Regions:
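Alpha-helical cap/lid subdomain in secreted, periplasmic
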Residues: 4, 94-282
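Non-cleavable N-terminal signal-anchor transmembrane helices
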Residues: 16, 20, 158-161
Length: 283
């Protein structure tokens, strides 16, 4: 009897490991319109304008509603080709380290949405250590580290491309406007705005637009960051990839209007990003 129980438990553990591994694989799959795939294609239309969207998982669009796909669906027929240069977990430092591939795409436009992980890393020592290990950071992630890497990112893009550049302020972490996590994204968005002004690139006020929307809805979120954002985030990944639950349903089940799990976006949030970029391109 004991042997059967042990065997059953072992089988269950194996199944759980397989499901978790499958979820991680799905979450990390590269988008079809990645820089690498773009560069492999032998014939790119010379008539299309190339738009590279730089970012982290919010741009990557596997664990967050894919705003790059919204842009591609809306504008590909208008002579624009969108490249998804988002990679899960990236901080501004990581983007600087992989700029060569992006620059090789010879973009006409570049949008930058980076800093959510930088802000999240600064919220606790535990977060900081995890990001330093997982993302091979050379120093502790803080405001200075973020600011200098955003500045270097823009400097290299201006020096090595002829692209028109826009950088977006950050979506909030969570939806409690008074919480330190939300306020930290506001602080990092101020850094983004200042760097944009100092380097003469366009600034797109995503954080401000989301805040205005949440205030207009008189929204009071049900969950707090302290409820365990990583557990809530991983549960959302499992629900999406194993059960097919939409990002909108995940957001609703967690009591959110814009984010799904504190860090990532539902359709409403992704559309706010896409609308800002679309209006900027057509200005």
């Amino acid at each position: 009897m004991i042997i059967k129980i042990i065997a059953g438990a072992a089988f269950l553990i194996i199944i759980l490991i397989i499901l978790y591994t499958y979820t991680l694989f799905q979450a990390q799959k590269s988008p079809l319109n990645s820089p690498a795939n773009f560069l492999k294609e032998s014939a790119q239309s010379k008539n299309n304008k190339t738009v590279v969207c730089i970012g982290n998982s919010i741009t990557h669009g596997r664990v967050s509603y894919n705003y790059v796909n919204i842009l591609s669906d809306d504008l590909s027929g208008h002579g624009y080709h969108f490249i998804n240069a988002g990679i899960n977990g990236n901080l501004a430092y990581n983007v600087v380290k992989r700029l060569d591939e992006i620059i090789n795409c010879d973009p006409d436009y570049v949008t930058i949405l980076i800093g959510t992980n930088d802000a999240n890393a600064s919220l606790s020592k535990k977060n900081s250590v995890r990001y330093m290990n997982d993302m091979a950071l050379p120093e502790e992630p803080n405001e200075n580290f973020f600011g200098k890497n955003v500045e270097e990112l823009i400097f290299q893009l201006k020096k090595r491309t002829n692209a028109i550049i826009a950088i977006l302020s950050l979506p909030p972490i969570g939806e409690d406007i008074d919480h330190i996590a939300y306020q930290r994204t506001k602080e990092y968005s101020v850094i983004i705005r200042d760097v944009a002004q100092e380097n003469d690139v366009d600034y797109l006020p995503l954080h401000e637009n989301i805040t205005e929307y949440l205030i207009s809805e008189n929204h009071r979120p049900r969950l707090s960051y302290e409820n365990g954002f990583r557990r809530i985030m991983i549960n959302g990944f499992l629900s999406h990839f194993l059960l097919g639950t939409s990002f909108d349903k995940i957001a609703t089940s967690n009591g959110f209007l814009i984010v799904t799990d504190f860090l990532h976006l539902n359709h409403r949030g992704a559309k706010m990003v896409a609308d800002l970029i679309k209006n900027w391109i057509f200005k």
